[in-house]
Amino acid sequence: SRGFRVLNWNSYKGSNKIWQEDLERLSSLSDLVVLQEGYLTDNLQDLLNKKQYNWDIAKAFAYNDIYAGVLTASRIKPDFLCSFRAPEPLSGIPKTVLITRYPLSGTDEYLVIANIHMINFSLDPSDYRAQLKKTAEVISQHRGPLIITGDFNSWNTERMKILADIIQELGAQEVVFDTDHRATFMGQQVDHIFYRKLVPLEALTEKVRTSDHNPMLVTFRLADDA
């Protein structure tokens, strides 16, 4: 198959005109648009509707009647979705997870996408582990092709170890980028894309000025044994 392209971006509640131009350009090449800190302005809704995306948002909070959270948009409609929140111990503003499932045309397979924004300001690793484990419990019902993507706030080795263990349990592996401009915090990369029963054909990152995170663009095809 020709494959499909996934854009993942923590867009930092993007709302200005240049940010919108970035998103318009990046999304025009993408079958799936996965945002963290998506800020559901009228402009963003117009852009998604104009491009005929089906989209869902797991709301973290509302500010001035505008919802913010993780948002997943796709060319095809999901046949299942599940979302939940994990409270930030210090700020009180929750982080959200959105899990969607898509029937893959021409096959009897389904693709599951987990769009994750992990909690940040918690020194207790059990909070971090609990949010990932809850996500993994939902995903573990699905045996087929899988993408786990987002801002994992994996800024220390303890968090990276928790993340790596759960990803391994799910039989997934991490995308390696040809050019790697992913955001780092305290020396660790925080944005990741993991996959299972798929083959990455191209994996790029792009430097932008409109967010403190750089977008990740990956083209996948189904693995032969999917």
Where are these predicted regions, by residue range?
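Metal-dependent phosphoester-hydrolase catalytic domains
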Residues: 101, 140-143, 152-226
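Active-site neighborhood of phospho(di)ester-bond hydrolases with catalytic His/Asp-centered motifs
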Residues: 33-37, 56-59, 147-151, 174-179
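Loop/turn elements at helix/coil->beta-strand transitions in domains of secreted/extracellular proteins
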Residues: 2-4, 29-31, 52-53, 108-111, ...
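Active-site metal-binding loops of divalent metal-dependent hydrolases
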Residues: 11, 38, 116-118, 150-152, ...
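Active-site-proximal beta-strand elements of phosphoester/diester hydrolases
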Residues: 3-13, 82, 109-120
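His/acidic metal-ligating clusters that form di-metal
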Residues: 99, 103-105, 110-112, 126-149, ...
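N-terminal, active-site-proximal structural segment of metallo-dependent hydrolase catalytic domains
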Residues: 1-50, 62-67, 133, 223-226
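Structured beta-strand-rich core segments of catalytic domains in phosphoester-bond hydrolases
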Residues: 32, 36-110, 206-207
